[in-house]
């Protein structure tokens, strides 16, 4: 994979429900995919009192606690944008990487546009499930993270903590990239 001018940033969010605006983004975790020690995380104040009980249960987060301890969404997005700018040089392109990227990107995109007016990731995201689907030629059913892990054998795991999950996704991304390189050599 060419990475000389592209900085792949693994991003994970935890939310109170399935769509931005009606539901809140509760936390952001991110790391540079090929340098995961370069990382960012924050908790956000809810923008809505709406929630799906199962979404809250899986995160272990509380809207009440986040009203007190979370960052104002403007501050959170400013900090996230500043972090992104700190890991990307002027001649480099930042690429959003996610597992089910369409979900995480929709919240990040919404919050960046509503609170800052633009999204430093632009209009596209690289989806790890789709990347694996293309590399492995597996069925879509076999692109779940638990199924991918059986093949690529990551050392980390996801646990619905946004930063932990971003680091896990970054590891899956690197391992799938390595698998892709191996398949090229096998041809």
From Swiss-Prot:
Sample GO molecular function, one term: 3'-5' exonuclease activity
Binding residues for Mg(2+) 2: 12, 25, 160, 165
Coiled-coil blocks: none
GO cellular component, one term: cytosol
Xref: SMART domains: EXOIII
Residue intervals of the Exonuclease domain: 9-173
Binding residues annotated for Mg(2+) 1, in chain numbering: 12
Role noted for this protein: Effector component of a CBASS antivirus system. CBASS (cyclic oligonucleotide-based antiphage signaling system) provides immunity against bacteriophage. The CD-NTase protein synthesizes cyclic nucleotides in response to infection; these serve as specific second messenger signals. The signals activate a diverse range of effectors, leading to bacterial cell death and thus abortive phage infection. A type III CBASS system. A sequence non-specific 3'-5' DNA exonuclease that preferentially degrades ssDNA with 3' overhangs or a mismatch at the 3' end.
Protein name: 3'-5' DNA exonuclease Cap18
Species, as recorded: Escherichia coli
Gene: cap18
